[in-house]
């Protein structure tokens, strides 16, 4: 029993040791696999929460990976220590068990020599109850046999039998004891051999465990060393970066200085080259002048010699055959009449023409030289700007993006910025505005979506979150600004101008209609027909005065037009009484009359044919690959023979022109006197309408209207038409919201080109309203010369820079060299040369300022006023031949690009002056400085043209000013003194009062019953009878 238990314990110990060996045989691959699984689980848990931060900030991810590795290593070390402790405890237990087993074997070996009581004590110590009981049972039998005193008394008859049995039993027991002793000795020998084998195995296992522990210890130490090495490497990298930063700053400074020196040297060399070129050009000009003078003298001499030879030959022929020559040839007669002074005049004319041509060529050369010099100066300025930008960037501190911080105080602490510093955000370019703010010590926030800013300048109003803006943050857009910036919003807001000022909309804004509104569409059709009638009358009168035979063809058309216009513009008070006349008045133009007026216009069939032929042309051009190009005209040189003919022809024509002028002057006098009754009526009507209608001069002979999409800019989708059918068809075909506006047919032209004026306006507040006018504008020209024959050519009718820059121009003049633009000074000089005084400053500019005020006042109720908001607007204005300005549109976020040299200078100045107004003047005004000190602060070229009063409760369409009452004085006589009333008079008065009260009560009851009936009729659907009855009642 004891041996079996011992063997079972040994087997259990071996299994536990094998399991421990397997658990401690750890490789590097197992550790790496566990580490990867652990990191994957850790990342999967937190990936959705912190993914956007890890993408933007990879440094955070690296730091967290380091922390994860350190935690994993710490846990691994703890596990190793715990396994060590478990292993040590198990080893101790095994040693104790082995000692106990050895002690047991020793006890069994000495059991033959020991007494029975000692054997029992040993067994009791080892807690072997089952063995103890078996031994006690054997001993009880022995005691009964060997010790009779403990035995019970028995019968005498059985004594003999017991004695024999006793002897037999003793012999058998002794034999058994000997056998047991021999077996026990064999078992003890076997146990000793097994114990020695087990001890040898334990020693081997202990040595293996010690090797595993040493490996683990070495591995942990190696990991610690790696961590230390990484930390040391990171510290070394930090030190290197700090040293590299200091070195890079010094290198940048040295690099900038070297660049500056190189650029200065290049500029010096370039200036030397320019000086040499200028000297060479002067010498060449002198030589050319000398050659020109010599050529002129040679031409004069040659021409005079040839003329003298011709005259001498002609005189000889005249003297020989005087009569025959006069009868046959008329050329000789004309040559005879030519005298020497006339020849000299013709020569001077030819020489002047040559001079003009030479001067034009010189001007072209000088303009090209000036352009070359300007381009060189431009390059110098750009290089200087680059150097300044590099130096500024080296000084400016680069900030980190912090997307999850909303408070300004925390953001400044994280960026390590002082609390007093001002922060701005700029979106969409605007480099000059950035420079202006950086000069003033502001700091740029690179994160455009951040709520941490003091000023934000954006291209679009969508980029501003109006719901979450703080009241002290400055923004460059107003909410709901479409009431002034969109074409439909401007139209609707200008209709309410009479609530704010005594100004007529028709004096500065051409007629405009919304094609999507049915009422306005009908008004447009009516106004188109009326303006067509006016154009017919103008055309008829012009043809009649020019004595063109075509005026008889359009006389019927003019008679109908005059009839229509006189009926329409007749006083409505004379027409309203007669129902027939009233219906004709409101109908304005019947269909029969319109057919006569629109006889020269396009019908629906003609429009379909036109579209068909246009598609066929497009298909042919696409198939053949033909491209239409503008033909370049080349100048041809004139020979001496051509000059001679021109001289003789000009001398002959002068006499003929003088005779014709005398005849024409006599005829014109007769025309003024002799005029038909119809034409005189037309003339009188047109003169009356010119006085009454402020837009009379805009209506020309062609009746052109311009169609615009309401939401597009830069000339996109704009077309011009003069046929009603085409306008309606175009408006229906477009899915966008369209607007129709009267085309200005009498614009001022400069060198046969149409132009408009771009003006910048700044609004800093709506309550109280503050308007700033930038006192320098620029002019934008069309790319081609103006004509109304081809309305599809956008280069003739549109002045947007986005369109004109696409035109490939062949020749160059002052306008094209400047990018189809003029400065304000050039415009003023043009008016001084043509009109003799500065028309822009004296007449046009005051009207433009009034237009700006009226347009902004008209929408002051609809635009949401917010403190610390401002906006820059771009006004487009055109001028007619009477020097009246007309408002075309108002733009938000006007283009501030360097499209030309003119815009480059002005854009820089505008953005710098905006910073002066908003930052310098605005911040000083908020601080509560006196007005005298505020006036000293410079605002550049921005002038305040309007400062309104603050309104606490602004109502919709509130009356602002100019409520006028008119009338005449009245004489009121004093009432006569009445006599005292008697008793009868009092009774009569009481009766009258009672009757009046009864009538009032009766009327009130009737009124309440009528209201109840009306409510029932509105609530129920009316039948045909009830509708007729209600109409009769009304």
Curated annotation (Swiss-Prot):
It is found in: Cytoplasm. ATP binds at residues 741-744, 754, 756. Residues 189-199 have a biased composition (Low complexity). GO terms for molecular function: ATP binding; protein-glycine ligase activity; protein-glycine ligase activity, initiating. Disruption phenotype: Cells lacking TTLL3A, TTLL3B, TTLL3C, TTLL3D, TTLL3E and TTLL3F display shortened axonemes that are resistant to paclitaxel, indicating that tubulin glycylation changes the lattice properties of axonemal microtubules. Axonemes are however normal at the ultrastructural level. PROSITE patterns: TTL. Residues 1-13, 131-146 have a biased composition (Polar residues). Residues 1-21, 131-166, 189-208, 1002-1034 are annotated as: Disordered. InterPro entries: TTL/TTLL_fam, TTLL_monoglycylase. Its main location: cytoplasm. SUPFAM superfamilies: Glutathione synthetase ATP-binding domain-like. One of its GO terms (biological process) is protein polyglycylation. It comes from the Eukaryota. Residues 151-161 have a biased composition (Basic residues). One of its GO terms (cellular component) is microtubule cytoskeleton. Keywords: ATP-binding, Cytoplasm, Ligase, Nucleotide-binding. Its EC number is 6.3.2.-. Pfam families: TTL. Residues 571-930 form the TTL domain. Probable glycylase which modifies tubulin, generating side chains of glycine on the gamma-carboxyl groups of specific glutamate residues within the C-terminal tail of tubulin. This is Tubulin glycylase 3D. The lineage of its organism: Eukaryota, Sar, Alveolata, Ciliophora, Intramacronucleata. The gene is TTLL3D.
